[in-house]
Amino acid sequence: MSDGETAVIQSLAPGPIDGVSYPLKMVYCGQCSMPPEYCDYSGQTDVCRAWATQNAPELLEGLEISDEPAADGDEKKKQKRGGKGSKTGAAAAQAAASGGKKKGGGPQKVTLQREPRGKKSVTVIKGLATFDIDLKVASKLFAQKFACGSSVTGADEIVIQGDVKDDLLDLIPEKWKQVTDEQIDDLGDKKR
């Protein structure tokens, strides 16, 4: 500030302000739980407007809850939870809904493949879900049997840490009778 200017400072005195009734009564939207002046930012403007016209019409007089997109022509985009949906998760839900069978009624086959991961390798099993085998139970069995890590990574895929492909050729038909030796296909090693 320059020497000739003075700032006006209004100090708030402790205690109640004249003309204000206490306790203050705040009204919140019954749909988005925000104050009505912020309903425009909740992403539920049509529902908020319907609630306000039904429950608190006096609030709509001074407010402007817009239904149209912003004035610059850009559409408002609602944020959705969960980010991008994984395709494998959608396929897993579809497989579970259809009883675990693959579409098209193709041949039921279990494939085993060894994949290099750095200096070590993993064994990938695909096709167990076509035989109505619970992948979580199978993964836990493999982890206990081979004393290694095992996880369900896709809709119909189990990854076991280590090269246990030869042992799986014997274990799978022994544990699950519906899978025969002829239905297990050894794909060998995956190239880098």
Curated annotation (Swiss-Prot):
Q: Which GO terms describe its molecular function?
A: translation initiation factor activity
Family matches, as Pfam families:
DENR_N (PF21023), SUI1 (PF01253)
Kindly give the InterPro entries that the UniProt entry links to this protein: DENR/SUI1_TIF (IPR050318), DENR_C (IPR046447), DENR_eukaryotes (IPR005873), DENR_N (IPR048517), SUI1 (IPR001950), SUI1_dom_sf (IPR036877)
Q: Among the record's GO biological process terms, what is one?
A: formation of translation preinitiation complex
Ranges for domain SUI1 come to 117-176
Q: State the SUPFAM superfamilies in the record.
A: eIF1-like
UniProt lists compositionally biased (Low complexity) regions at: 87-99
Annotated region (Disordered) at: 62-116
- Tell me the superkingdom of the source: Eukaryota
Disulfide feature: none
Q: Which family does it belong to?
A: Belongs to the DENR family.
Q: What protein name does the entry list?
A: Density-regulated protein homolog
| Organism name | Caenorhabditis elegans
What phylogenetic lineage does the species belong to? Eukaryota, Metazoa, Ecdysozoa, Nematoda, Chromadorea
